[in-house]
Curated annotation (Swiss-Prot):
It comes from Borreliella afzelii (strain PKo) (Borrelia afzelii). HAMAP family: SmpB. The gene is smpB. This is SsrA-binding protein. Required for rescue of stalled ribosomes mediated by trans-translation. Binds to transfer-messenger RNA (tmRNA), required for stable association of tmRNA with ribosomes. tmRNA and SmpB together mimic tRNA shape, replacing the anticodon stem-loop with SmpB. tmRNA is encoded by the ssrA gene; the 2 termini fold to resemble tRNA(Ala) and it encodes a 'tag peptide', a short internal open reading frame. During trans-translation Ala-aminoacylated tmRNA acts like a tRNA, entering the A-site of stalled ribosomes, displacing the stalled mRNA. GO terms for biological process: trans-translation.
Amino acid sequence: MNTNTLLIENKKAKFNYFIEEKISCGIVLKGTEVKSIKAKKLSFNNSFAIIKKEELWLENLHVSKYKEGNIFNHDELRPRKLLIKKKELQRLKKFKEKEGYTLIPISFYLKKSIIKVEVGICKGKKLYDKREILKQKSIKKDLSREIKYK
């Protein structure tokens, strides 16, 4: 039985980056942030993970304010600490030292009742890579249509 429930996925990450590896980690959140994320009120635009002082931080993740929240509502763009084992952090450092690699949040999911983040070690795609993928998708669609109508 799979206990992981996908909350939200970063679809642009798969289009803009080659995902080399995925790492699951916890995230430090406030109460109203948890409720907003469970309501799928977050945006991945320009978000990334960065290593500061032997810790992994998620930057530029926009979590909307909780509608029923009061004066204790959270700051929408605050940096959020990611919880990860030291061995995995060392491995991430090695990838970050290489040219062109970045850490991008791929998805948020529930494991039992705890919110987890899947962070991908990604390398940016060039424009011609994206065009090639779009061509392959359109060819695949055309073939499936032809097969369907024959």
